[in-house]
Amino acid sequence: MAEFRIDPEMELPVLPSRARADVSRKPEWLKINLRTDAEFVELKRLMRGQGLHTVCEEARCPNIFECWNRRTATFMILGDICTRNCGFCAVRSGVPTGLDLAEPERVADACVQLGLRHVVVTSVARDDLSDGGASIFAETIRAIRRKNPFTGVEVLIPDFGGNWDALAVVMDAEPDVLNHNIETVRRLSDRVRSRAKYDRSLELLRRAKEMKPHVSTKSSIMVGLGETMQELYEAMDDLRAAGVDIVTFGQYLRPTARHLAVEKFYTPAEFEHLREEALKRGFAHCESGPLVRSSYHADEQSAQAVARRTGAGRAAQTGD
């Protein structure tokens, strides 16, 4: 079959091709300039001083410099060894050891020291724990609230193996945003996500919204794994049916040769098309771009939720 290339100037929508694009080299729009200025080095030193892990580093996020300079960060709690082995993820897999009960307070202290405006708390999957780590998520949210009441808090959670009592523990702690990623379209889910289930993820998002309707819910999709545009439309429809408020789209980039191959690099025009389609479907917000990751510009996405939560307290402090 002839190779199919998309002119960035062509009119959308773009009909997908099953032919694999030339992915031997990254296109120009995926190239970034890495920076290690003094502020970045200081932030990294403070993270290490607290004995904390960030998914920004563990997952080799291309936006780490921008986000840290915006005073936003994504902490990875419950250790740095995952009990699952997803085909796209750079985080180490294996058998975790122990549970650090002091970690929530250290994360909260780091938020103060770093002056964070917004924090995302995520974790490795901990299928070895009866609640999947939900209680540590909840205590981390509460610890941040006690010490940083005006810092936005988003949690990016695993599926807890379908343990809805564990989900309720997290929701009762009242995060500003509850994020759980479906990662890919239904057809590819079993190949891409180790031990996760597409419909179980949708059920988690639906239940989270039912438990706390005022908490924004969010999910993310990687593109470039062999999905079609129609399948992406269907995934958006599935997320909206589950009551999801925010969706993000980003280009899948292969961490190592051992991970799933990139099937296609999407153009900036195609990402803009996905954003438009998401907004048409009623999502309150959509981030869509080649370098977008789940937590990209998370501070902007949750600003309204934080304002609702802290409005009364801020008014009391100022006497308004």
Swiss-Prot record:
Disulfide bond positions: none
Locations listed in the record: Cytoplasm
Domain of life, source organism: Bacteria
Catalytic reaction(s) noted: [[Fe-S] cluster scaffold protein carrying a second [4Fe-4S](2+) cluster] + N(6)-octanoyl-L-lysyl-[protein] + 2 oxidized [2Fe-2S]-[ferredoxin] + 2 S-adenosyl-L-methionine + 4 H(+) = [[Fe-S] cluster scaffold protein] + N(6)-[(R)-dihydrolipoyl]-L-lysyl-[protein] + 4 Fe(3+) + 2 hydrogen sulfide + 2 5'-deoxyadenosine + 2 L-methionine + 2 reduced [2Fe-2S]-[ferredoxin]
Pfam families noted in UniProt: LIAS_N, Radical_SAM
Cofactor: [4Fe-4S] cluster
Binding of [4Fe-4S] cluster 2, residues: 82, 86, 89
Binding site for [4Fe-4S] cluster 1: 56, 61, 67, 295
InterPro entries named among the record's database cross-references: Aldolase_TIM, Elp3/MiaA/NifB-like_rSAM, LIAS_N, Lipoyl_synth, rSAM
Root EC class: transferase
Cofactor binding remark: Binds 2 [4Fe-4S] clusters per subunit. One cluster is coordinated with 3 cysteines and an exchangeable S-adenosyl-L-methionine.
Regions of compositional bias (Low complexity) in chain numbering: 303-320
GO molecular function, a single term: 4 iron, 4 sulfur cluster binding
Record protein name field: Lipoyl synthase
Organism: Symbiobacterium thermophilum (strain DSM 24528 / JCM 14929 / IAM 14863 / T)
Gene (name only): lipA
